[in-house]
Amino acid sequence: MPGVARLPLLLGLLLLPRPGRPLDLADYTYDLAEEDDSEPLNYKDPCKAAAFLGDIALDEEDLRAFQVQQAVDLRRHTARKSSIKAAVPGNTSTPSCQSTNGQPQRGACGRWRGRSRSRRAATSRPERVWPDGVIPFVIGGNFTGSQRAVFRQAMRHWEKHTCVTFLERTDEDSYIVFTYRPCGCCSYVGRRGGGPQAISIGKNCDKFGIVVHELGHVVGFWHEHTRPDRDRHVSIVRENIQPGQEYNFLKMEPQEVESLGETYDFDSIMHYARNTFSRGIFLDTIVPKYEVNGVKPPIGQRTRLSKGDIAQARKLYKCPACGETLQDSTGNFSSPEYPNGYSAHMHCVWRISVTPGEKIILNFTSLDLYRSRLCWYDYVEVRDGFWRKAPLRGRFCGSKLPEPIVSTDSRLWVEFRSSSNWVGKGFFAVYEAICGGDVKKDYGHIQSPNYPDDYRPSKVCIWRIQVSEGFHVGLTFQSFEIERHDSCAYDYLEVRDGHSESSTLIGRYCGYEKPDDIKSTSSRLWLKFVSDGSINKAGFAVNFFKEVDECSRPNRGGCEQRCLNTLGSYKCSCDPGYELAPDKRRCEAACGGFLTKLNGSITSPGWPKEYPPNKNCIWQLVAPTQYRISLQFDFFETEGNDVCKYDFVEVRSGLTADSKLHGKFCGSEKPEVITSQYNNMRVEFKSDNTVSKKGFKAHFFSDKDECSKDNGGCQQDCVNTFGSYECQCRSGFVLHDNKHDCKEAGCDHKVTSTSGTITSPNWPDKYPSKKECTWAISSTPGHRVKLTFMEMDIESQPECAYDHLEVFDGRDAKAPVLGRFCGSKKPEPVLATGSRMFLRFYSDNSVQRKGFQASHATECGGQVRADVKTKDLYSHAQFGDNNYPGGVDCEWVIVAEEGYGVELVFQTFEVEEETDCGYDYMELFDGYDSTAPRLGRYCGSGPPEEVYSAGDSVLVKFHSDDTITKKGFHLRYTSTKFQDTLHSRK
């Protein structure tokens, strides 16, 4: 295969491992056993490659191909002093590492620099092209459902526009593995062969355009800007390139790259952006040399394949001149020039691909082809699968219409060939995707119609899954997003334990949370998906497999007391008062216990003496139904501090280790009283093998919980109080007038309180996708709004281009920006210049996180502008409701425009009185600061009714001590024409 000119070879530096140390392939493999339950997978980890060529990682095979002339000691190697030469006989399959903005990452890949040369021209390597355009894939288990959906959307995008096919791997030797590695976005170029090859989708790389770009490398593309003819089309601005990254802009020699006759493509998804590896975000490193349609063409897009990308891929994989990939749930296609006959020597292929779990009905509505024995000359052929070697369902010619064809899976291959000109019509066919059906396999995938895009309205799909006798059916959800409703009345997925609609109901599911794993009691499981005619969501993706219950065997998996079956495995556990022995099967006596009294006490082992090392004690406290348990510590002393890494006490609502956590405590500070969420509580004490302390003593008591029965009648959250309860709604909802139900609130908020808390929608759960919320905060005039972040967990991106919170210094989004925030690092407090602040939160349709929690308050002082319109200024934010607080010092600078002075009119003035105004006072200065002439210090009943400045500004200072407080002051200010002299009137 000639190396396709959409990724650079980057002949920057070849970095070798230490001389004298043999290469061990085990050093460059990564175990996927924990990521994929189907089987352990080993592939070479590009982050541990044997060598690097610029930002390209090389393995042993690549090293042999490159015939390296010189080795370099890694320990002695420095980025600026190395000079290594390599012979490059051909285009090899080498990983290219790239970050979220189209730039190679400065990490394990592409971190060394130097000089190199090629002694021989690149040769054609046809083995790097995927045979028949079929690329098997595996997605590692460490990705979320939304990430998997993005990967599938990107693969379907390539399939839609080319003849490449991405197929879930079964037993193929060569395939790609989507995984998460430190290299960031990193993938091999072309087919490596001889086993799996990694495509790393690292941190912040899980965006549609970025994944499409990385799949371009898998298909066989190099970066566009390294073509030999690039200097005719773009200029490299070398003075703007980051030091040490210049080698990323080398171009390839004419004999090293094959552009397949395509012109330079500014719009290619494989092109670097204008500021790639730039010293600054606004400095260009690549600039187009000429205009296209009157403007300089944009470069570096990560939105979709360009026309040039599509044309080049179709040439590389020798796609038929006619035909296409059909992915809609219904559609039609016909022979060329239908119904006016077709030309000789035509070859067309249509690939029909619908959602896994669906089948295809293909119906020929018109057929008029040259008839021959065995349809030898002109024919249309249908195969039951994804390629030309799939099982043949029929070869047709003549004019007799075939019976409708139903696929056994979600793909059909339709091929048309002609050998002569024919005056007949040709053919016309229609197809439709049908969901549901009988699934008799031990392993497989089922997805909602049209997944990962929104499912279709008014669909009813029923799947009957059957695995081998003697096994159970296991279900694991990869992704789940179905229209939410409290009782799943509209759209839902229903799962039943059997093979019919009358079987035992396991659950009816909707919303955005993935259901727990499901296991049938027999070898059959029944699934039903229903959508109504209105709101459509992304749907679901689920894996099914045969599952055996080890705990049902006579020896209960070898467990002495309890055996807990899990999907794909099992684990042993012990009764309360016992703990697992080191062999993880036997149980031995332990501290703790199972307590059902309404009140009592618990202590650490050995109390009141020091507790022993290596103890693990669990107390399970259970009260009657409708009661809650409160735990109060009388004494507390354990090893540790805030980290609680060594010895600690952990308190949870519930009886299991994954119940709601109230707190993890250590050190010498007594925890506050803890009240359980339900009628049970779990208290766990752990000590390590080093320092021991006195431990703890605590007592517990019970109180009736009205929320435990029918949630107190509350639709969402019920909060128990001693002797009563109250209903509350989550963020994004408000309480109904009946004080029990919740109704959805708008996401545009007006906040007028002087202080409070603001959270992202659905806090503390993940915020929904495609959401935009605003908060317009207004405070008392003269007091600036201050925003302090308590928690921050928003999808991260260097420029916060995806999900983000934006803060504006004013009443709306037209005001100056104070900051745009994302990621998990808490921003510093944000302070407005005035009494208004505007917040806007935005989420896209992919990754969701917990969101943010922030408090807003006020800070006195600042600069305000006076004009002809009268404005107000108050001594404190809660003026009229409370006295001013003690211990404050505030300064306001009131500024008028040039040629105007400032007029102050006091409406209210009540400040602690003292002869010299030495305690609380207001002070006025005729200027910007306290060096200006002082107009006076006032307390008690206050200054004159009106005050005029001699200049264009007035400084107002207010001070209070920490004792007596009063009502404060309220003044109004305007701008006036300058007076000849400063004066005041009463």
Swiss-Prot record:
<feature type="active site">
    <location>
        <position position="214"/>
    </location>
</feature>
<feature type="domain" description="EGF-like 2; calcium-binding">
    <location>
        <begin position="704"/>
        <end position="743"/>
    </location>
</feature>
<feature type="disulfide bond">
    <location>
        <begin position="800"/>
        <end position="822"/>
    </location>
</feature>
<feature type="compositionally biased region" description="Polar residues">
    <location>
        <begin position="90"/>
        <end position="104"/>
    </location>
</feature>
<dbReference type="GO" id="GO:0004252">
    <property type="term" value="F:serine-type endopeptidase activity"/>
</dbReference>
<dbReference type="GO" id="GO:0016485">
    <property type="term" value="P:protein processing"/>
</dbReference>
<feature type="domain" description="CUB 2">
    <location>
        <begin position="435"/>
        <end position="546"/>
    </location>
</feature>
<feature type="domain" description="CUB 4">
    <location>
        <begin position="747"/>
        <end position="859"/>
    </location>
</feature>
<feature type="disulfide bond">
    <location>
        <begin position="707"/>
        <end position="718"/>
    </location>
</feature>
<feature type="domain" description="CUB 3">
    <location>
        <begin position="591"/>
        <end position="703"/>
    </location>
</feature>
<feature type="disulfide bond">
    <location>
        <begin position="375"/>
        <end position="397"/>
    </location>
</feature>
<keyword id="KW-0165">Cleavage on pair of basic residues</keyword>
<feature type="disulfide bond">
    <location>
        <begin position="574"/>
        <end position="587"/>
    </location>
</feature>
<dbReference type="InterPro" id="IPR000742">
    <property type="entry name" value="EGF-like_dom"/>
</dbReference>
<keyword id="KW-0891">Chondrogenesis</keyword>
<keyword id="KW-1065">Osteogenesis imperfecta</keyword>
<keyword id="KW-0225">Disease variant</keyword>
<dbReference type="GO" id="GO:0008237">
    <property type="term" value="F:metallopeptidase activity"/>
</dbReference>
<keyword id="KW-0245">EGF-like domain</keyword>
<dbReference type="InterPro" id="IPR009030">
    <property type="entry name" value="Growth_fac_rcpt_cys_sf"/>
</dbReference>
<dbReference type="Pfam" id="PF14670">
    <property type="entry name" value="FXa_inhibition"/>
</dbReference>
<keyword id="KW-0333">Golgi apparatus</keyword>
<dbReference type="InterPro" id="IPR006026">
    <property type="entry name" value="Peptidase_Metallo"/>
</dbReference>
<feature type="disulfide bond">
    <location>
        <begin position="644"/>
        <end position="666"/>
    </location>
</feature>
<dbReference type="GO" id="GO:0006508">
    <property type="term" value="P:proteolysis"/>
</dbReference>
<dbReference type="GO" id="GO:0042802">
    <property type="term" value="F:identical protein binding"/>
</dbReference>
<feature type="disulfide bond">
    <location>
        <begin position="747"/>
        <end position="773"/>
    </location>
</feature>
<dbReference type="InterPro" id="IPR001506">
    <property type="entry name" value="Peptidase_M12A"/>
</dbReference>
<dbReference type="InterPro" id="IPR024079">
    <property type="entry name" value="MetalloPept_cat_dom_sf"/>
</dbReference>
<feature type="disulfide bond">
    <location>
        <begin position="729"/>
        <end position="742"/>
    </location>
</feature>
<keyword id="KW-0106">Calcium</keyword>
<dbReference type="Pfam" id="PF00431">
    <property type="entry name" value="CUB"/>
</dbReference>
<feature type="glycosylation site" description="N-linked (GlcNAc...) asparagine">
    <location>
        <position position="91"/>
    </location>
</feature>
<keyword id="KW-0964">Secreted</keyword>
<protein>
    <recommendedName>
        <fullName>Bone morphogenetic protein 1</fullName>
        <ecNumber>3.4.24.19</ecNumber>
    </recommendedName>
</protein>
<dbReference type="GO" id="GO:0008233">
    <property type="term" value="F:peptidase activity"/>
</dbReference>
<feature type="domain" description="Peptidase M12A">
    <location>
        <begin position="121"/>
        <end position="320"/>
    </location>
</feature>
<feature type="glycosylation site" description="N-linked (GlcNAc...) asparagine">
    <location>
        <position position="332"/>
    </location>
</feature>
<feature type="region of interest" description="Disordered">
    <location>
        <begin position="83"/>
        <end position="125"/>
    </location>
</feature>
<feature type="domain" description="CUB 5">
    <location>
        <begin position="860"/>
        <end position="976"/>
    </location>
</feature>
<dbReference type="Pfam" id="PF01400">
    <property type="entry name" value="Astacin"/>
</dbReference>
<feature type="signal peptide">
    <location>
        <begin position="1"/>
        <end position="22"/>
    </location>
</feature>
